[in-house]
Amino acid sequence: MSMIRIAPEVHLVMDPDTAVVAEEREDSILYSMDPVFERMDKLDGIAEDLLNSLSPSKPLLNSWPGRENTSYMAGIYGNAFYGIVVGLAFSGLLALIIFIQRLIEGGM
C-alpha cells in the first residue's frame, strides 16, 4: 500500500488504489505491503507448480516450452521397460522350471 505525498508541508497524502486524499497522521505508522505481496505471488507460483507436478500434462515452472507431456511419456517408457524386464524374468523362470521337470522325468 503506497501513498503519494501531495503536499508534505500540509501533510496531505493520496492513496493511488482508491484515489482518496486525506491528512497524514503523526500517530499512525504506515508500512508498505508491496514486498510481502511480491513474495506471496512468488510462493503462489511455487504452490501452483507443486500442484502441476501431480498432473503429467501440465508444464512445470522450470521446464522449457513444449515439454508438457514429458512426465506422461516418461511414465509410458518406464512402465514398458519394467514390464518387459518382469515378463522376461517370468518367462525365463517358467522355461527353467519346465526344463528341470523334464530332466526329473528322464526325458530330454
Curated annotation (Swiss-Prot):
It is a single-pass membrane protein. It catalyses: 5-methyl-5,6,7,8-tetrahydromethanopterin + coenzyme M + 2 Na(+)(in) = 5,6,7,8-tetrahydromethanopterin + methyl-coenzyme M + 2 Na(+)(out). Its main location: membrane. The keyword Ribosomal protein does not apply. GO terms for cellular component: plasma membrane. Its EC number is 7.2.1.4. Pathway: One-carbon metabolism; methanogenesis from CO(2); methyl-coenzyme M from 5,10-methylene-5,6,7,8-tetrahydromethanopterin: step 2/2. Keywords: Cell membrane, Membrane, Methanogenesis, Methyltransferase, One-carbon metabolism, Transferase, Translocase, Transmembrane, Transmembrane helix. It is found in: Cell membrane. GO terms for biological process: methanogenesis, from carbon dioxide; methylation; one-carbon metabolic process. The chain crosses the membrane at residues 80-100. Coiled coil: none annotated. It is an enzyme of class 7 (translocase). Belongs to the MtrB family. NCBIfam families: methano_MtrB (TIGR04166), PRK00965.1 (NF002129). The complex is composed of 8 subunits; MtrA, MtrB, MtrC, MtrD, MtrE, MtrF, MtrG and MtrH. This is Tetrahydromethanopterin S-methyltransferase subunit B. The gene is mtrB.
